[in-house]
Amino acid sequence: MDDAVGERLERLNSMLKRRGIILPAFEIHGGAAGLYDFGPLGGRLRNRVQQVWLDHWLSQGDITELSCPTITPYSVLEASGHVGEFSDFMTTCDACEEGFRADTLLEEYHSNPDSLSKEELAQELAKYSPPCPNCKESEWGDVSAQNLMFNTRIGSGKSGRDGFIRPETAQGMFTNFQSLYRHFRQRLPFGAVQVGKGYRNEISPRQGMIRLREFNMAELEYFIDPEVEIKHDFSPWKGKEIRLVPDNSEEVMMSIPAALESGIIRHATVAWYMARTADLLENLGIDLERLRFRQHEGTEMAHYASDCWDAEVHASYGWVECVGIAHRGCYDLSAHEQ
């Protein structure tokens, strides 16, 4: 990021604070990285965005809303794979002993450092020796995985259980599948949405509101029968080209129906939700010239996904992920059933 962009962001952050939109949390006690308050205007703006999101998806007709606890038993997130897999690779500066995400240190040297393995990250750090964001030295320790969930204890004494503060809202929707199935009279497809808080113990929160330790999430889970074809109506998007970045390929401008027909997008329901997401973002004021859908490389795919596309918006920090659309297959339901 050049100096001019940095100065503009400083002025923006100052304005957001001055006008009561975004405020550093617990500032009179020194604050805490990755925690922010929504002020009087910020809270109203957030609520309006959330309501637009809810109205957009609930209007589809086969989607309902849930609200699940943020405190989650250990067994739930063990079954989902989060206990073993929900982690980022970190390294520590030998000079100042601050920890950082290894991939973020390499963003200026590699086109997609999030796709690198632990060994590859270590090799790239040794090759480029990026400066420490804190002290500017270039002495890095070993790369290791750190789980991102906040631990807690549910209850006290002998009857207490280990648990976590949820890292995503999705698991409550999966564990309620049978109730949802009955609600929809035992007919697929159907979906559920949930708006609420998510919590991740980020290694190095940065970029203002982009990477936080407590944040607002809005998730939709849509359940289909893989043996029954759904006839999605793509006619509204046939002439509407959008920027796509397929796995290991060059960026292309193509309509979502054309990308589905050509096999770039592998599943019709994934394509449907990409198109509907583009409509939502445009309705919220995002310039489609600044929007792209990027497919995850195999090495960066979440443990539960067989395919994933991120909706990214080009901003002062570069391309910023704002929506993830993943084909989770039967992973979650099978995991909880076992």
Report the location of each language-model feature.
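TRNA-recognition modules of translation machinery and tRNA-sensing kinases, especially anticodon-binding
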Residues: 2-338
